[in-house]
């Protein structure tokens, strides 16, 4: 059955939905977070289409309000300005959550950041073979470490380390350089970029952090470094409607906090980049300009990141627009632009409407600094009249509870979607150069009305039911909107058993959907798959030619790659390079490789297993041997492996995985060789698979420490090919 998803929970905050680029939909539900992951086509094959749409999703629910004493130390009473009784005594419910851009977590997935009401910001990701969601970092410690040398008073240090709001920036990617070497791969900083996170603390400091995952598993899973700090202590622009000298105004301004923020686009220069960060400081809107310089350290940096970045930030609100002081900004905030547009638009929620601030890109790109004109448009929320006789349309004054920017699949232009706590929804498309932006209906308006009318009919409310929006999220042309429905003419009594959150799924064009379709290989023809595979083979075979200063790869991986090329490839240049690598291996080890060298020009040949005297002799470590009987392993296929005595590797592993995932096991062919290193996967627990196409790979974390050269080689190769060689899908354990 196609339709909205109904979940037995109630959201604990506005903007309660966040959708990662990997397809995982996170929902803030009090002291829990619920994550919905779409099932792939094979998993949905045996399900009845008449069942509820929720059956098309995997559902995981985990607690986020349980902390150890090391994670959340005991806080003793402080003075009135530093002690937050509500935060310390709260139930630590979720007040905000957001996925990071892809590339930060293990297997280049997304990390989930969760802010709880005790003012702690945590990072979560699935850990272990069972994929249990676990807290892997608390970012308040990075603030405490930074401010510890600056602030001496314990109470002020507590305020500096409490986090009130946060926002992920879009990935800051290094411009891709033109590579002239064959089979080269862009660095991770160009594929995934740097991951920056802005946080606002209890002392109204805006801190920009760089979050990164160390290359090895030693120490903390994630590290956070402070790049810049901006302090907003001036409160004169807040609450302009109040008498500045009144006691009430003074009390209000003493409690001002930064509660929402949003990153704008990056503008790239030759060796630097600049961007904007908009924040709501009380009722005022502030704009921070960030200049980032990328430093390339020498290669002898050990476990440190290959590239370092430094940042300088400053408040440019007066330069950005001088006439913002008369508005009561409440948030949320969002930016709209395209790569080829001449303008950028900042959308900011106000007390009873929306402000659109349109500015030229040219001053920020260094093209024409004198052409920076900023235009302002104020939008008020009016209900569309049902008939021509209505002269006074209903105006909505509720706060904006959800706002996102999604790319329209038809026009390929960004569209701002918003919803209020009173059920008003609107869509504002971005139009480069237009002075006025129109308001349109959202594509899921009919679905929302159907949910509300069904609730109204079931309870005989006479058309007085109201729908409240709690959050919106978008992913790959899909939009999810979370709503609840309530009686509009009475006090509502609701028990925990009656809590319901309805998630409406829609495309940007307005068609109804059950969710994301599973990712598939764009071209599954043998020729396309061979080309994808040859790109990885060529990278390994040309590894030392492209950079002689790098540590060489493992001899066993080089030999396996050369054999795989002989068996599979028809590329003469690649076969010639395999011949060159085999000659180098024979020279280094002194092993007789004439059999392999003679087959570099043959087609669809096999390579016999090595006898025991060669396996035990000099250079024998580069040949594979059976872990059961120590016999040699033949090369007859790039997908299967069998030793001289008949042991076939991977059958138990494939059967176990099929049993765990409740799918039928296909006996032929069985993927038993790593799709990147070409090594035979003999241990059932030493592999990982592509979550899209199912190709099997060796897990670099499962390699024994004694095999240091193989471990280094696998980590080096999987750093370069951190997604599936064939379909660019993400790995999973």
Give residue ranges: language-model regions.
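Structural core positions within WD40/WD-like beta-propeller blades
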Residues: 25-26, 112-113, 198, 277-278, ...
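Residue-level signature of beta-propeller blades and closely related beta-rich strand-turn architectures
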Residues: 31, 39, 103, 118, ...
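Structural signature of eukaryotic scaffold interfaces centered on beta-propeller domains
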Residues: 8-20, 86-108, 154-192, 250-272, ...
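WD40-repeat beta-propellers
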Residues: 34-38, 97, 121-126, 166, ...
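Short loop/turn segments that connect beta-strands within the blades of beta-propeller domains
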Residues: 21, 29-31, 108, 115-118, ...
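C-terminal scaffolding/assembly regions of large eukaryotic complex subunits
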Residues: 1-26, 31-45, 52, 79-82, ...
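Beta-propeller domains
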Residues: 1-5, 23-87, 120-146, 154, 190-195, 199-361, ...
């Amino acid at each position: 059955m196609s339709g909205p998803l109904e979940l037995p929970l109630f959201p604990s905050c506005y903007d309660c939905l966040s959708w990662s680029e990997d397809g995982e939909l996170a929902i803030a539900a009090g002291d829990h977070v619920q994550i919905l992951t779409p099932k792939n086509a094979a998993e949905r094959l045996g399900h009845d289409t008449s069942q509820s749409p929720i059956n098309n999703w995997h559902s995981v629910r985990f607690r986020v309000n349980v902390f150890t004493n090391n994670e959340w130390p005991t806080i003793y009473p402080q003075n009135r300005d530093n002690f937050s009784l509500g935060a310390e005594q709260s139930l630590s419910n979720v007040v905000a959550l957001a996925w990071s851009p892809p590339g930060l977590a293990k297997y280049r997935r997304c990390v989930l950041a969760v802010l709880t009401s005790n003012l702690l910001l945590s990072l979560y990701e699935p850990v272990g073979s069972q994929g249990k969601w676990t807290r892997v970092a608390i970012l308040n410690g990075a603030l405490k470490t930074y401010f510890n040398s600056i602030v001496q008073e314990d109470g002020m240090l507590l305020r500096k380390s409490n986090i009130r709001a946060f926002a992920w920036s879009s990935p800051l990617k290094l411009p891709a350089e033109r590579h002239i070497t064959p089979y080269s791969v862009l660095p991770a900083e160009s594929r995934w970029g740097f991951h920056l996170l802005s946080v606002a603390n209890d002392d109204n400091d805006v801190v920009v952090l760089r979050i990164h995952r160390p290359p090895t598993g030693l120490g903390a899973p994630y590290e956070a470094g402070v790049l810049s700090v901006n302090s907003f202590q001036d409160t004169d622009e807040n609450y302009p409607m109040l008498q500045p000298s009144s006691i009430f105004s003074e009390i209000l301004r003493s409690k001002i906090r930064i509660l929402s923020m949003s990153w704008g686009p990056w503008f790239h220069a030759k060796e630097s980049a600049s961007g904007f960060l908009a924040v709501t400081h009380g009722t005022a809107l502030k704009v921070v300009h960030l200049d980032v310089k990328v430093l390339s350290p020498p290669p002898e940096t050990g476990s440190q990141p290959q590239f370092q970045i430094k940042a300088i930030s400053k408040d440019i609100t007066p330069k950005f627009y001088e006439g913002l002081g008369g508005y009561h900004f409440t948030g949320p905030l969002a930016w709209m632009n395209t790569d080829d547009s001449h303008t950028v638009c900042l959308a900011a929620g106000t007390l009873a409407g929306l402000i659109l601030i349109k500015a030229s890109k040219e001053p920020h790109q260094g093209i024409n600094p004198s052409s920076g004109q900023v235009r302002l448009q104020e939008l008020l929320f009016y209900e569309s009249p049902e008939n021509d006789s209505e002269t006074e349309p209903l105006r909505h004054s509720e706060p904006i509870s959800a706002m996102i920017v999604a790319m329209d699949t038809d026009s390929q232009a960004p569209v701002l979607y918003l919803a209020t706590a009173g059920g008003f929804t609107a869509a504002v498309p971005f139009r480069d150069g237009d002075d006025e932006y129109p308001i349109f209906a959202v594509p899921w308006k009919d679905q929302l009305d159907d949910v509300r009318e069904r609730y109204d009919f079931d309870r005989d409310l006479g058309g007085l039911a109201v729908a409240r929006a709690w959050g919106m999220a978008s992913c790959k042309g899909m939009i999810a909107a979370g709503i609840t429905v309530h009686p509009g003419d009475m006090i509502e009594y609701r028990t925990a058993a009656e809590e319901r959150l309805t998630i409406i799924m829609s495309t940007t064009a307005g068609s109804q959907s059950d969710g994301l379709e599973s990712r598939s290989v764009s071209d599954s023809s043998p020729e396309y798959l061979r080309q994808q595979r040859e790109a990885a083979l060529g990278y390994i075979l040309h590894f030392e030619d492209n950079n002689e200063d790098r540590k060489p790869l493992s001899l066993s991986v080089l030999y396996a790659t050369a054999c795989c090329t002989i068996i599979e490839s028809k590329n003469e240049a690649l076969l010639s390079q395999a011949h060159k690598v085999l000659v180098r291996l024979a020279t280094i080890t002194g092993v007789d490789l004439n059999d392999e060298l003679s087959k570099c020009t043959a087609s669809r040949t096999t390579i016999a297993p090595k006898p025991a005297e060669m396996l035990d002799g000099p250079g024998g470590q580069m040949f594979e041997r059976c872990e059961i009987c120590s016999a040699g392993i033949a090369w007859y296929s790039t997908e299967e492996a069998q030793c001289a005595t008949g042991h076939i590797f991977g059958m138990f592993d494939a059967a176990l995985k099929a049993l765990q995932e409740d799918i039928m096991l296909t006996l032929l062919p069985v993927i038993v060789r790593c799709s990147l290193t070409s090594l035979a996967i003999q241990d059932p627990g030493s592999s990982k698979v592509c979550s899209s196409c199912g190709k099997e790979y060796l897990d670099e974390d499962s390699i024994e420490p004694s095999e240091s050269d193989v471990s280094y080689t696998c980590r080096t190769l999987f750093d370069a090919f951190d997604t599936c060689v064939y379909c660019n899908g993400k790995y999973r354990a």
